[in-house]
C-alpha cells in the first residue's frame, strides 16, 4: 500500500515518513494526510502545504467501490485528488477476509488512462441481470464499454441501460437524479426524465451488436421487463424540483425494500413519498426507541445532514452495499 501510494505521489520524504509508521498510524496518515514542514518563505507567506493530501471525499464511499452480484469493481476516479481513495478500497477488497468476493472485475487503482473513468454513483444494479449506468462527467464511455463487457462475460448481466447525463454540476452522477426506492418505485428529477427535456437513453444487450436508443428511461425499463413508477423529487413545482434536487433530494439509500434513509430538509420530496405510502420517521427517535418501523412498512428515516449536504451528496453516496438479497 505504501509503495502504491508513492507511485501516485512520489516523494523521498514521504517514503521515509510512511516507512517508519506502524499500521494504525499509517492508515491515519493515508486518510488525514501529512503536512509538509514549512520553510522560511512558505512560513512567511502562510503557504505551507501537504506532503500527502487528506481525503475529504472518502466518506462518499459509493463512488470508489461497487459490488455487483458477487463481484467487486474498484472505481477509477475522475480527479487525482481521489486516486489514493482507490488504493485504500482496493487493499480492503483484495486483502481483508471480511471483504472476500468472487473476484475484482476491474481495479481502477491500476488505471491511469484519462479516458477510462468510472465512479459508483453512476452504477445502479437493479436486478441480478440488469444494471443502469450513467454516462456523466465522472464516468466515461470507454470505461462503460469495458464494464459492460466484464458484466456480460462474468456476472450474468443481460442488459445495461445507459442514461446520458448533462454536463452540469447538479448531475455529476446518475444517483443525483435517479434512485430506485422500492421494487416498483424510483425517485427521479422530472425535467431529465419526463417531457421535452428528457435525457437520451441507450440499451445494450448481451450478444447483440451496438446499442439501441430508447424513447426514455421508463420505456427502456419496460423493454427489459422491469417497469418502475416514478416519484417526483420536489413534487409538481419546477422551483421545488430544482431546489431539492440541488440538495440531494433524489439521493436516498434503501436499507431494505421500502425503507429509505434521506435528508429531512427536502420537504416537497418527502410529501411526494408520503403520498406513495411512506411514513416519515426521524432518525433520532428511531435510535432512541421512540419510533419503530414495522416489517413490510414503507418508511423514510430522515437525517438532518446540514453539513453533509454541502459536500454534494446524500445517503446513497455515503454507503457502499456489500451484499444484497435477491428481489
Task: Describe these PLM feature segments.
Residues 1-327:
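The feature marks the mature, well-folded catalytic cores of soluble enzymes
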Amino acid at each position: 500500500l505504501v509503495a502504491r501510494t508513492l507511485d501516485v505521489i512520489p516523494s523521498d520524504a514521504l517514503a521515509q515518513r510512511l516507512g517508519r509508521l506502524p499500521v494504525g498510524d499509517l492508515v491515519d496518515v493515508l486518510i488525514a494526510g501529512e503536512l509538509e514542514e514549512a520553510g522560511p518563505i512558505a512560513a512567511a507567506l502562510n503557504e505551507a502545504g501537504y506532503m500527502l493530501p487528506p481525503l475529504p471525499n472518502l466518506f462518499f464511499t459509493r463512488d470508489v467501490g461497487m459490488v455487483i452480484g458477487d463481484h467487486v469493481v474498484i472505481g477509477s476516479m475522475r480527479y487525482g485528488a481521489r486516486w489514493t481513495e482507490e488504493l485504500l478500497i482496493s487493499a480492503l477488497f483484495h486483502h481483508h477476509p471480511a471483504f472476500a468476493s468472487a473476484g475484482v472485475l476491474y481495479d481502477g487503482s491500476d488505471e491511469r488512462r484519462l479516458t477510462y473513468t468510472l465512479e459508483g454513483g453512476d452504477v445502479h444494479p437493479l436486478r441480478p441481470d440488469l444494471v443502469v449506468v450513467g454516462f456523466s462527467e465522472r464516468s466515461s464511455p470507454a470505461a462503460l464499454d469495458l464494464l459492460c463487457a466484464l458484466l456480460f462475460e462474468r456476472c450474468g448481466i443481460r442488459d445495461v441501460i445507459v442514461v446520458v447525463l448533462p454536463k452540469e454540476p447538479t448531475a455529476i452522477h446518475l444517483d443525483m437524479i435517479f434512485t430506485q426506492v422500492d421494487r416498483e418505485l424510483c425517485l427521479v428529477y422530472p425535467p431529465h426524465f419526463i417531457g421535452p427535456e428528457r435525457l437520451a437513453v441507450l440499451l445494450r444487450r448481451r450478444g447483440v451488436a451496438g446499442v439501441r436508443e430508447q424513447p426514455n428511461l421508463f420505456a427502456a425499463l419496460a423493454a427489459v421487463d422491469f417497469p418502475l413508477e416514478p416519484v417526483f423529487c420536489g413534487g409538481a413545482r419546477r422551483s421545488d424540483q430544482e431546489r431539492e434536487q440541488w440538495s440531494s433530494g433524489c439521493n436516498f439509500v434503501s436499507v431494505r425494500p421500502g425503507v429509505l434513509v434521506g435528508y429531512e430538509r427536502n420537504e416537497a420530496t418527502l410529501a411526494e413519498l408520503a403520498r406513495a405510502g411512506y411514513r416519515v420517521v426521524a432518525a433520532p427517535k428511531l435510535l432512541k426507541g421512540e419510533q419503530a418501523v414495522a416489517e413490510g412498512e414503507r418508511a423514510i428515516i430522515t437525517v438532518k445532514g446540514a453539513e453533509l449536504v454541502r459536500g454534494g451528496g446524500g445517503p446513497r453516496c455515503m454507503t457502499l452495499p456489500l451484499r444484497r438479497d435477491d428481489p
